[in-house]
């Protein structure tokens, strides 16, 4: 009984706080009652004679009675049912809604519901209409949903309060420093802007080096080491295998290579929606941990809370449909306006966008709140909303900015949730890289990079080419993989529906192509933004430029002379790493230039980045950067994404870090992701959170050095 009384007391207090005080709460209750009444009348109209309402005031009384029923009965039943079975919780939600409709039919004058089946259908129709109207009128932006989660977590939590702060690190995937600064000046991203203007946080910039993409950046940020990762995908000659950062088995291997046991999350930390783990104690939607035993969102109270709210899943489903139709409208508008650059945005992408902007954002936010109420030391979560939109629409288009505002609202929700958490939390917001705009290589020249190289070889090879998925699809796969590995009716249905897309328990909606290693003439061409990599898979060792000239005369010179190529790096047996450009050559090992320096256009860290790539064990036979227009900051991606990253040129190498004002960076502009690890580690130690013990065979991480090194050991 005491626990139940605590539940009601907490429910009332949190409800008041999450709705902005008594006046705001009263105003919202009145508006909610009006919207609910209209929804009830609309439901009766849809069901016609099988559900009737005599007068509008009868509908108002009915929804009021339903609200009382849900407030009084639902918590009593479900707060205990959720501890027993997720399936039981979900079923009880449906049953209670139907019972509420039947109770209303008995007690509310002027209301008639024709039996259980009509009540079942009516409860769904009512919830959908109410959710749509609420969303259109802006009555609730998620406050009730997250407020309910906070209520449940507070009742469940038995921990006392601690004054030692924890740390929440939010990664806004793909957001460049200059774009964030521009949105702040434009009056957008109000939460982040208020932190800066109130003097609690400082906006700083850091510099990403090759490859400027998520797996390399996250390995550097979370583990302090991103050696041996030449791109999002790469070919390993010794294993005759195409590595993919989005593949759970490959991501697990990456972590085993870069981790020394002292990841940022190694001391009671949580990884949410990431590629690598950071040696986290708990991981959710994390690619490298999908196949790990135990854990995952199926064991999460936040996931259970989704079923606890009668409108929770209907809210998400309705918002999902809304985002789907919104994308269809915006894509059509872009086509009609003739905006350039643009790309095809079909239904597959629309579904991916809706999943990223609705489902993943909700799940991420809920999981972070749950970990805060668990008292977790450090939480690192990746929001891919903006990155997904920027890839397909452009990093500075209205669709991308709307996604960014959505992430900003999620951060506001998290900041509010800390008020009831068992410990205070500091926030660091950062990005892993930026994005650069530009028509793709194929849009400009009619052929992909692989097709172009094959043509220059007169077709004397078998082409296998692959490009990087946007991060959003990777984490949708992670979400589906964890759902299908959970218990319950929903996961069972999902497993059956995704059977043909599932291998060893891992869902992949767009499986990668494996290089046919049996074909000695195969060339593997990988595009990662405007970074292109080429391997001649029939050779066990990296080919030198001399060997390439003997096997394929004139190929390197022809590739370097292509108008869509900015530079090509190869290895020379006599002169080391050599970079060819359209009007000159740079010998990296000799620090010598003939003609115009092809590296100069791409910035001051290009030589260091290329030397680092050249030293990697799995370096490609040919490494390319596309053409680059410094005036517009545009590149020509070797994949079909008009907003891209992975290479050099433009804001793709200009990520940001927004940190508490009292925490100083050890450099004005940190260079490389391991430098961010070094700063975050120092900040954690300053608030009494040391990292875990190193592995017995751990190597020194890059972050323990003063600068990124050229030599790379895998």
What would you call each of these model-derived segments?
Residues 223-236, 296-303, 368, 401-412, ...:
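Acidic, His- and aromatic-enriched active-site or binding-groove loops in soluble protein domains
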Residues 166, 177-309, 461-499, 503-510, ...:
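Active-site nucleophile/metal-coordination loop of metallo-enzymes that catalyze phosphate/sulfate
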Residues 142-144, 224-394, 526-536, 540-543, ...:
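His/Asp/Glu-rich, glycine-adjacent segments
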Residues 358-359, 363, 371, 379, ...:
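A long, amphipathic alpha-helix that forms part
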Residues 183-188, 289-293, 394-400, 437-453, ...:
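Short secondary-structure boundary/capping segments
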């Amino acid at each position: 009984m005491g626990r139940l009384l605590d539940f009601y007391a907490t429910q009332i207090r949190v409800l008041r706080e999450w709705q902005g005080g008594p006046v705001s709460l009263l105003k919202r209750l009145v508006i909610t009652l009006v919207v609910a009444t209209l929804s009830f009348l609309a439901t009766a109209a849809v069901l016609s004679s099988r559900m009737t309402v005599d007068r509008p005031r009868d509908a108002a009384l009915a929804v009021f009675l339903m609200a009382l029923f849900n407030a009084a009965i639902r918590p009593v039943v479900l707060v205990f049912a959720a501890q027993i079975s997720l399936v039981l919780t979900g079923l009880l939600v449906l049953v209670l809604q139907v019972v509420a409709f039947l109770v209303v039919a008995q007690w509310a004058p002027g209301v008639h519901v024709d039996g259980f089946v009509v009540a079942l259908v009516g409860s769904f129709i009512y919830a959908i209409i109410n959710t749509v109207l609420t969303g259109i009128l802006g009555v609730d932006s998620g406050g009730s949903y997250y407020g309910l989660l906070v209520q449940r977590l507070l009742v469940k939590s038995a921990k006392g309060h601690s004054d030692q702060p924890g740390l929440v690190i939010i990664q806004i995937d793909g957001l460049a420093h200059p774009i964030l600064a521009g949105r702040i000046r434009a009056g957008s991203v109000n939460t982040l802007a208020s932190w800066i203007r109130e003097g609690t946080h400082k906006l700083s910039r850091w510099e990403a080096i090759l490859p400027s993409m998520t797996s390399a950046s996250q390995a550097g940020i979370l583990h302090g080491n991103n050696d041996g990762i030449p791109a999002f995908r790469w070919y390993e000659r010794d294993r005759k295998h195409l590595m993919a950062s989005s593949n759970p088995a490959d991501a697990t291997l990456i972590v085993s290579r870069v981790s020394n046991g002292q990841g940022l999350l190694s001391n009671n930390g949580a990884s949410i929606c990431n590629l690598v783990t950071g040696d986290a104690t708990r991981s959710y939607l994390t690619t490298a941990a999908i196949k790990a035993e135990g854990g995952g969102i199926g064991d999460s109270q936040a996931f259970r809370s989704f079923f606890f709210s009668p409108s929770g899943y209907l809210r998400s489903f309705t918002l999902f449909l809304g985002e789907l139709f919104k994308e269809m409208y915006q894509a059509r508008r872009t086509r009609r306006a003739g905006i350039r650059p643009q790309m095809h945005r079909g239904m597959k992408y629309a579904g991916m966008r809706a999943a990223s902007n609705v489902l993943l954002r909700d799940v991420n936010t809920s999981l972070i709140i749950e970990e805060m109420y668990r008292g977790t030391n450090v939480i690192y979560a990746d929001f891919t909303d903006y990155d997904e939109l920027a890839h397909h629409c452009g990093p500075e288009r209205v669709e991308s900015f709307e996604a960014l505002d959505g992430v900003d609202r999620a951060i506001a929700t998290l900041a509010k949730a800390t008020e009831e958490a068992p410990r205070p939390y500091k926030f660091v917001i950062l990005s892993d890289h930026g994005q650069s705009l530009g028509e793709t290589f194929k849009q400009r020249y009619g052929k992909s990079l692989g097709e172009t190289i094959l043509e220059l070889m007169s077709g004397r090879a078998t082409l296998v080419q692959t490009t990087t998925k946007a991060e959003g699809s990777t984490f949708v796969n992670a979400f589906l993989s964890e759902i299908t590995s959970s218990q319950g009716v929903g996961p069972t249905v999902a497993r059956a529906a995704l059977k043909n897309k599932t291998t060893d328990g891992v869902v992949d909606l767009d499986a990668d192509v494996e290089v046919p290693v049996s074909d000695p003439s195969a060339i593997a061409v990988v595009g990662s933004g405007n970074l292109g990599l080429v391997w001649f898979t029939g050779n066990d060792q990296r080919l030198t430029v001399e060997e390439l000239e003997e096997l394929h005369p004139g190929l390197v010179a022809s590739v370097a002379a292509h108008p869509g190529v900015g530079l090509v790096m190869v290895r020379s047996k006599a002169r080391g790493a050599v970079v060819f450009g359209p009007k000159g050559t740079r010998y990296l090992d000799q620090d010598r230039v003939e003609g115009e320096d092809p590296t100069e256009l791409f910035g001051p860290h290009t030589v260091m980045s290329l030397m680092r790539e050249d030293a990697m064990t799995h370096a490609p036979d040919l490494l390319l950067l596309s053409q680059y227009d410094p005036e517009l900051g545009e590149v020509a991606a070797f994949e079909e994404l008009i907003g891209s990253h992975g290479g050099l040129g433009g804001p793709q190498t200009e990520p940001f870090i927004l940190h508490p004002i009292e925490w100083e960076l050890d450099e004005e502009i940190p260079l490389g992701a391991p430098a961010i690890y070094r700063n975050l580690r120092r900040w954690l130690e300053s608030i009494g959170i040391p990292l875990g013990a190193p592995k017995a065979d751990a190597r020194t991480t890059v972050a323990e050095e003063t600068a990124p090194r050229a030599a790379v050991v895998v």
